[in-house]
């Protein structure tokens, strides 16, 4: 059993219990949805499990880091939806250009985004959220990640990775889509 300290109290959890499962026990204490955990002072993803006794607190969508995690996940869901409805579109053609109020301006190079396409994308995004398809994290060597993103025509990511010092890169994927993100498509 692991001892998890939250808000000054100790709770026991079986080894292998993820932060996401732990977060469910405390979600009712938060007005916004829990997005990330702070474990022993470090921000962690909910899909991880504590490996030893840990002191935790949570970040929600209302917190900057939690909101950014939500936006990355929503972007992945959007890209997956676009890929599903327009399979000829490469991920590098889809750009999150800038924020507008609480929304984001998205462009798809080479595609005239009609109302019909936007409606299909929204419908597909809602389906993906409803399915709550798990998002899996995979740490891969930098060279393999670069090769993967070259194959996916994600040139901006390839350029960024070339300057990355770490030898490993975290890549996130659903059953049929790979990207750099929350534990499910519903978060």
Indicate residue ranges for each PLM-predicted region:
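Ubiquitin-like/PB1-type beta-grasp interaction modules and other compact soluble beta-rich domains
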Residues: 1-75, 80-100, 123-124
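Short helix/loop capping segments that flank catalytic or ligand/cofactor-binding pockets
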Residues: 68, 115-116, 180
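Short secondary-structure capping/junction motifs at helix and strand boundaries
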Residues: 90-93, 129-139
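Short, ordered beta-strand-loop transition motifs
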Residues: 98-102, 164-165
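A generic structural motif
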Residues: 102-109
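Active-site neighborhoods of enzyme catalytic cores
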Residues: 109-113, 120, 124, 134-177
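Conserved small/polar residues in nucleotide/adenosyl-binding loops
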Residues: 178-184
